[in-house]
């Protein structure tokens, strides 16, 4: 259904087409519509990616290169699907010193953060005298890192996916990213990859890249898992191949929610609202406030901010904020703002307030929570340290940000000594008999004792 905009007088003042809603005046169906994202229904994409996946599975490099030319409009062949050492070296000469410095700054902070996340290799606890149980963590043997490029170049995604994987100790890492028309890979992406510790990059994007790392080709080695955000094509391919490869957390088009109280200026809220709205027309971006003043100031400031942005990014953000997946939501109280935020479960959430910690305890459903007036999403996306690859489409209700633990697997460890064995055997035997498992029972019966007495 189409939501009906509220308080049209605000729109008239600014001469902008920004979706504006009074939350308390929406019925249940309209509130549910506000929660929808652009990729809520990807059934059409599931059908479209099917022949691409099958072609890569059966034709390998030939199909991968063909789709690179047809879909990415790039000069790629079967011979140049993998980035060479010379291309890596050349990238460092193409990147400005200031960008190189900022990439290194971000990588250093991301590494510091994720090193704190790394679990101990193993822990054991004495559950009962002589009986020990614990966990052992080992890295996943091969992981593919998807770095999108459709609406820009994203070395930051390379940083966010590569660093935790390297910290986790994954031995076989490879980046897949769409090539430029000349067949090259974004120079800053290659710089970030090498500085983070990844030296394998394939020139492939979209559904065909997901298929390549799932099935493997003559050039692309198959991986056990793929992580990283992507378009609906990538999301559909991941969903289709979830029985072939671990597709990680669901990361689709960008989302942001700015929860602003009455301690801030609405122009600041509008400034931060545009951060994720400019990613593309499939993004989602809402300013949520119970302050009419903040709402009016935000609407008044948007044209000023747009005037300072590039034409492409302005167009993207206007599409989002005037459409069905973005705008300004005016609530009747701060409690109603909390209600909407938790129902929405955003990817990025800013608590834009001079006193953000008074709001934090009321938020239960958000993947990333940025506090105060000096922590815009920009800083989190590029350099703060916490991972910016986050679950979208309300998956923040069950998933968290990409982390070191996404690149390791856990094995439980058990060790029962001879003195502790009889007590555990007795209780295990009782439950085995009750559940009707005769072999379970025999394994902790006198039959075992007899074999133990015989020895080797």
UniProtKB/Swiss-Prot annotation:
Co-factor: note: Binds 1 zinc ion per subunit.
Paired cysteines (S-S): none
Residues of the active site: 347-348
GO molecular function, one term: histidinol dehydrogenase activity
First-level EC class: oxidoreductase
Domain of life: Bacteria
Cofactor(s) required, per the database record: Zn(2+)
GO BP terms: L-histidine biosynthetic process
Residues that coordinate or bind Zn(2+): 279, 440
Keyword set, alphabetical order: Metal-binding, Oxidoreductase, Plasmid, Zinc
Family: Belongs to the histidinol dehydrogenase family.
PANTHER family in UniProt: HISTIDINE BIOSYNTHESIS TRIFUNCTIONAL PROTEIN, HISTIDINOL DEHYDROGENASE HDH
The protein, known as: Histidinol dehydrogenase homolog
């Amino acid at each position: 259904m189409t939501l009906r905009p509220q308080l049209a007088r605000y729109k008239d003042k600014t001469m902008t087409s920004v979706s504006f809603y009074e939350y308390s005046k929406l019925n249940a169906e309209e509130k549910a519509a506000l929660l929808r994202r652009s990729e809520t229904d990807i059934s059409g994409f599931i059908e479209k990616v099917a022949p691409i996946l099958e072609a890569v599975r059966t034709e390998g490099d030939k199909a991968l290169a063909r789709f690179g030319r047809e879909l990415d409009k790039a000069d790629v062949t079967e011979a140049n699907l993998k980035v060479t050492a010379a291309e890596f070296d050349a990238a460092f000469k193409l990147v400005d010193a200031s960008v190189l410095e900022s990439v290194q700054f971000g990588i250093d902070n991301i590494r510091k953060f994720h090193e704190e996340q790394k679990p101990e290799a193993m822990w054991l606890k004495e559950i009962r005298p002589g009986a020990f149980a614990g966990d052992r963590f080992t890295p996943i043997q091969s992981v593919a890192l998807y770095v999108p490029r459709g609406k820009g170049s994203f070395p930051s995604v390379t940083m966010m996916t590569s660093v935790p994987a390297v910290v986790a100790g994954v031995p076989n890492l490879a980046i897949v990213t769409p090539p430029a028309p000349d067949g090259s890979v974004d120079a800053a992406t290659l710089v970030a990859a090498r500085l983070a510790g990844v030296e394998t990059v394939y020139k492939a994007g979209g559904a065909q890249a997901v298929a390549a790392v799932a099935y493997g080709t003559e050039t692309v080695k198959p991986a056990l898992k793929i992580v990283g955000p992507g378009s609906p094509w990538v999301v559909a391919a991941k969903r289709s191949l979830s029985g072939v490869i671990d597709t990680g957390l669901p990361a689709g088009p960008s989302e942001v929610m700015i929860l602003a109280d009455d301690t801030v200026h609405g122009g600041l809220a509008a400034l931060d609202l545009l951060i994720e709205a400019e990613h593309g027309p499939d993004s989602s971006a809402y300013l949520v406030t119970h302050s009419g003043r903040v709402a009016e100031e935000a609407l008044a400031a948007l044209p000023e901010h747009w005037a300072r942005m590039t034409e492409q990014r302005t167009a993207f953000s206007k599409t989002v904020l005037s459409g069905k997946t973005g705008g300004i939501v005016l609530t009747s109280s701060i409690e109603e703002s909390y209600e909407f935020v938790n129902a929405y479960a955003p990817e990025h959430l800013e608590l834009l307030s001079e006193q953000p910690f008074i709001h934090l305890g009321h938020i239960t459903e958000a993947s990333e929570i940025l506090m105060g007036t000096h922590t815009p999403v920009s800083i989190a996306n590029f350099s703060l340290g916490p991972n910016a690859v986050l679950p979208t489409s309300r998956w923040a209700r069950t998933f968290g940000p990409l982390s070191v633990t996404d690149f390791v697997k856990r094995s439980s460890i058990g060790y029962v000594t001879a003195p502790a064995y009889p007590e555990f055997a007795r209780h295990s035997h009782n439950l085995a008999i009750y559940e009707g498992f005769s072999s379970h029972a025999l394994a902790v019966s006198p039959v075992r004792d007899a074999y133990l007495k015989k020895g080797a």
